[in-house]
Amino acid sequence: MLQTAALILAAGKGTRMHSDKPKVLQTVLGEPMLRYVLEAVRPVFDGRVLVVVGHQAGMVEAAFPDASFVHQEQQLGTGHALMQAMPALEGQCERVLVVNGDTPLLSEDVVRHFVEASEGADLAFATIELDDPAAYGRVVRAADGSVRAIVEAKDYDPALYGPEPHEVNAGMYCVRLDLAARLLPRIGNANKSGEYYITDLISLAVAEGCKVQGVQCGRDESLMGVNSPLELSRSEEFLRERVVDGLLRSGVMLHAPALVRISPLATVEPGAEITG
């Protein structure tokens, strides 16, 4: 298995949150979102984890003094974030997993499955199915099912790509470092956001004949990002239900489970009794 490191993208401001606090420090069940992502990736990569910070970087660094950071002084997109991290990654790994820091439902099992499923690919990305794709990047496939590209929602033109698909980019990638080093300089920012998208690596890799794999994860909510207070609230409820279900299955007595709010990082022994 190729030596792999993880890169967590945590530089964005999160404008739609309408808060001065960095988006990854918004809390879910009392813990900042970034903590859940770190907890999911650290066991898989034996500490080979970097966090890209930008907006209010000092606040994020202070909240996680045990993490290693790369600075993205200008927030020019996900592709630009990977560019800034390349000097720190080169010589340390053969491929890199890139994941968004605003996915508080992410689990170690999902990360491990994705890394193992993408082992034979030059570049892989996770996809999920959504009834309403909203602002997610659309996965464009050829007639034979092979991946053609990921097109950001605001740039999607049905005249060019066909009817909008329900399969969307889940924001988790695994790419060979030598391929990233070769293709990143060719990414442009001629799009409506004026940003450098990491998703552009996919169409470039396809054009080069590289093995590009879209790892389908069904409707798994664990990969859903948080971009607004509404999505934050929904993620918290998903996580609360997951915690409650786990406690009940482990032998914890909950008398009013609908009222229980416990951090998934808390330890509750079997036989404990919680009244709400």
What are these regions (language model features)?
Residues 1-5, 31-116:
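Conserved N-terminal catalytic core of the sugar/cofactor nucleotidyltransferase
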Residues 1-19:
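N-terminal nucleotide-binding beta1-loop-alpha1 segment
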Residues 193-276:
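Left-handed beta-helix
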